Design a protein with these regions (language model features):
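Short, conserved SAM-binding/catalytic segment
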Residues: 177-183
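Core catalytic lobe of class I
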Residues: 1-175
């Protein structure tokens, strides 16, 4: 199943396009292997997810991170480092320009920010904004194969991107479409 949707993603992705796959630690290794068959993996971003809601109480270490796999169709891809550096709170601007942005994102919390209403399953607006800023320009297409409540679509629309979303649950898709149109 995962191989099928990743193959379709590779098929429709433009040559300079990118895929960002957000995963918890349990499935991260599997996704690394699967992505490696269709894409060029550029890096693994570690995002500090501060609210592990769906995680059972642990007898050992509580996981507070998610992996974001950044992969591209080719090694010639769009990456807007200057725009990401300007919008990053990770470091002061001088060292960001000197060092570049890092793959450790501890400055984005899993809480509601901005005017977008956060729905169940939505990632933080700032997280999606950073990803879209890094790998797209206004009027570029953003595809979300797991639209759920439409959070990525709402943010893409706010940022002037065109959006296509897929969702297997028809009721959920209709609610997401309504949400994207409204916001």
């Amino acid at each position: 199943w995962n191989e099928n949707w990743l193959k379709e993603s590779a098929r429709i992705l433009k040559p300079t396009g990118a895929i960002y796959l957000i995963s918890g630690w349990r499935f991260s290794g599997m996704y690394h292997s699967l992505l490696n068959t269709e894409f060029h993996i550029q890096t693994r971003i570690t995002w500090r997810n501060s609210t592990p809601k769906d995680q059972p109480k642990s007898l050992t270490w509580i996981n507070r991170i998610s992996d974001i796999w950044f992969a591209t169709k080719s090694n010639e891809f769009m990456f807007n480092q200057e725009a990401v550096t300007e919008g990053s709170n990770q470091m002061n601007p001088e060292s960001a320009i000197e060092m570049g942005v890092t793959n450790l994102w501890s400055d984005i919390m899993d809480i509601q920010v901005g005017s977008t209403v956060k729905m169940e399953g939505d990632k933080p607006e700032q997280l999606i904004q950073r990803i879209l800023t890094a790998s797209s320009f206004k009027l570029n297409w953003v595809v979300d194969p797991f639209t759920r409540s439409g959070g990525v679509g709402v943010i893409a629309k706010k940022m002037g991107r065109r959006f296509i979303g897929f969702e297997s649950d028809q009721d959920q898709l209709l609610m997401a479409m309504k949400r994207i149109d409204k916001e």
